[in-house]
Amino acid sequence: MSQNKACDLCRLKKIKCSRGQPRCQTCTLFQADCHYSNRARRKRLVQRSKETFGGITLPVFDYAAGINGNEPEPSDHSIPNQENFALTTNGTISKNIEKPEDGEESVQRRLKLLEEKIDLLLDIATETSEFKRENKAIELPSLVTQIKDAESIVIKHRQGSPVDNTPTRILNVESLFPPQLPDWEKAFHDIPKKEVAHELVTSYFQHVNWWWPTFVYNDFMYEFERLYAFGFHSNNAWLISFYSILALSSIRKRLGNSKTLAESLFSTAWVFVQKSDFFLTPSIDKVQALIVMTQYAAYLSSSSLCRTLCGQACLMAQQLNLHRKQSTDVEPEKAESWKRIFWMCYILDKNISLIFGTPSVFNDKDIDCNLPDSKYELLFGVQSGGDLIFVPTVSLTIIQSEIRNRLYSVKSPTQMAAREKIIIPIHQKLKAWEENLPSEIKMYHEMLLNNTFSPTISLSDRFEFLTFAGMEVYFSYLNTLIILHRPSSSTENRRICINAAREAVQLLKNRLNIDLRVNVKADPLWIFLYCPFTPFLIIFNNLVHETDTETDSETLLNDLDLLHVIYDFFMEMEPVSDVALELVKIADKLLRVAKEVCSAKNNDVTDSTFKDIVEGFELNDLNSWDFDRVTNVMRNL
């Protein structure tokens, strides 16, 4: 005779049996023997089951001990003696009691058992929530996510503060990233004068294209001469690149009318993009045009334009198979140009997805493209040295993408121990990347960090080009360290984060104090304001949230000084970017909270001492800088 598919206890309780061995889940829960009876007539089986399992109930106290991690004491769940027990009407086994139990006592006893079960369920729920809180998934540290984290810290601080004068509402996403589209009415109807256009194009190749190589210099200038020779150009994609380059160069000059001029030039490029045939077929010229437009939108920190333009550029690059190895039949110069165009799309895609917390277009497992070859770097700029920045940036972006995929994705481990196993090898990759940086970049970094520059080096053109570029590389590296160690709660990882944040802000402070002219040549990606704001929040969190923060007045005042440096930087970027204006408001609220916390930790930290030690920096009026020659040229536009 065959056995039943469910054990006897599951059949009695009318529960689906898992048929596990040696005991199913139900029998394990009730700590009963798991027995499978042969198929028999239903009445006899039900009667025997009631007699056998009727008195089995959930062992509350033993189960609670199992939840707490202790071994439960063995319990006797054998069948009771039929002489001393009798079968009740509801199928349970009870002792033969001569006197029936009083009704009130029965209700109290049941209420007590109910309270015990509720307490047990609450204990289980509490332990489960604490376990999830300790091993929860880490959200991608986008700009909005970091500000929300800071907002939660402020709310927690305000709840324990007797005086509450600062509103806890810090972030308004709509005001931080408002939807912005170019205005068609501002577009140019005529081609700009050649002298003006040549000045702006040369500036772009000197300060942008040489270390973000998108165009071959000779090829672009050939098309430039054709435009002014014939008075028109038949390639709309090239015209989009042309007007976008003029707009980006104009806004980077930061003259009195540069913002209005840049908006008009970019609106002209936007008119050509809106033509119906632009997105129908992919081409190299269109990818280049979208890259420059993305750079302009990145300089203004326009989130909607950045995501749209960069996404279309990356999709076109994939359709053209730029992420694959090029055939040997392609000319080496052309293959190198296509390779660099792809890596430009890759860098933009990964940075924008990180800053705004959006999905990345490229899948790293699908990429089969070699790194740029430095022997071709002179094709893309008017001077050498660009690959000292571009090639390490590509390698660093690949590591950043690995960090995101392994620590911040849906499949990332939630246990802290598993995260540590991922963090250690990636940290070693980052240290190896830093050791393999070009010696010239390391030299500029050491001089910048220690605020020691020789007059000979400071007056050279190479210093002007490479110092800020090297600062951008190290700023990205320090932010990558923060992103890597941020998911871990260990003391060592927190120490790495706070040291990286302090070094990043110190770099910014020293650079802007040394030579204000280089500030004009700030990289568009860096002006996203994401890189400066990340160390700002790390230092703020260390001051306010952490309980083991150093409480000596010197350390607290130095950290407040660093926060004030970032605040001053946002103030100076306010005329360029609308996002900077919102970050100024956010930084001001956080800075006030940090001052209150530091004063509570150490009585020596007061407003007067803070004002004495904070040096800050105040940039000169940008309109008073020595750009008379360029100003006269732009006035003719």
UniProtKB/Swiss-Prot annotation:
Record GO terms (molecular function): DNA-binding transcription factor activity, RNA polymerase II-specific; RNA polymerase II cis-regulatory region sequence-specific DNA binding; sequence-specific DNA binding; zinc ion binding
Keyword Kinase tagged: no
Keywords, comma-separated and alphabetical: DNA-binding, Metal-binding, Nucleus, Transcription, Transcription regulation, Zinc, Zinc-finger
Known DNA-binding region: 7-34
Cellular-component GO terms for this entry: nucleus
InterPro entries: AtrR-like (IPR050987), Transcription_factor_dom_fun (IPR007219), Zn2-C6_fun-type_DNA-bd_sf (IPR036864), Zn2Cys6_DnaBD (IPR001138)
Transmembrane annotation, as ranges: none
Entry coiled-coil feature ranges: none
CDD domains per record: fungal_TF_MHR, GAL4
Primary location class: nucleus
Zinc finger regions, C2H2-type: 304-327
Compartments it resides in: Nucleus
Transmembrane as UniProt keyword: no
A Pfam cross-reference name: Zn_clus
GO biological process per UniProt: DNA-templated transcription; positive regulation of transcription by RNA polymerase II
Protein name (Swiss-Prot/TrEMBL): Uncharacterized transcriptional regulatory protein C11D3.07c
Species for this entry: Schizosaccharomyces pombe (strain 972 / ATCC 24843)
